[in-house]
């Protein structure tokens, strides 16, 4: 069958279409994988309300995605909404608009989000190596720890790029650093992982992390380059220092830079650097497979 996943995030809205390989097979083939920046979660950190214009533009993108699904004879479309919709008191206004399009819609917990990211990033891996999968989003960041093909331990923390853009209007990066480490330290799971003697590898998913490769190399986005790339803490720190000292117009000259990411990429890079510092890790492996694949597996296989 041909199935579709729509991931409705705080900053972006993504469409993933794939075809399963027979009724009893666990294999699937990607057909479509696209993203649009919709900023559904703008202002939600403070107001807890989804902005009317943000709702309208996100639903317009979902309408476009539905047409793409129809053009590819998709049998079922399933949408998953994350942090912004979770936090909003007026989430029903958005949910009803999506459901009118004939889409199976779910508002998921941060734990479910983290499990999907872990599954997507590790489902092709074998062996006894443990992984900590990190998914930096606009409203929250998920940390998922465990072995491939097992159910990971997950914590979702309300630290994300859109939140930080809004918070930085009233605080400095020095204050943000303290805030990040306080939020990470509150998690019993993360403190436990931090103190472990066993070896584990960091895997980073989503554009804030994978995009660091192309900022560093000054080349256009190419998932074949970023997937599996070992991103060093020195590269991340260098990217932050460079981005921080650039104007938004200068950031736009970076070949891979999306015009709607020029503001969020700076606090996002800062967050990634602080996460590696927290865990005392020098490298994180980038993965272009993430919660889209994870959701597809759990929904259709």
Q: Where are the predicted features?
A:
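Structural motif
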Residues: 12-14, 140, 209
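Short glycine-aspartate micro-motif
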Residues: 3-7, 131-135, 202
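Helical "lid/coupling" subdomains associated with nucleotide-phosphate turnover
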Residues: 17, 43-68, 82-95, 99-130, ...
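Conserved ATP-binding subdomain of kinase catalytic cores across diverse folds
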Residues: 25-44, 60-63, 70
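Short beta-strand segments at enzyme active-site cores
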Residues: 76-81
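Acidic, divalent-metal-coordinating active-site segment for phosphoryl/phosphodiester hydrolysis
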Residues: 138-145
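N-terminal basic/disordered segments at the start of proteins
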Residues: 1-29
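Short acidic/polar active-site loop segments enriched in Thr and Asp
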Residues: 11, 75, 282
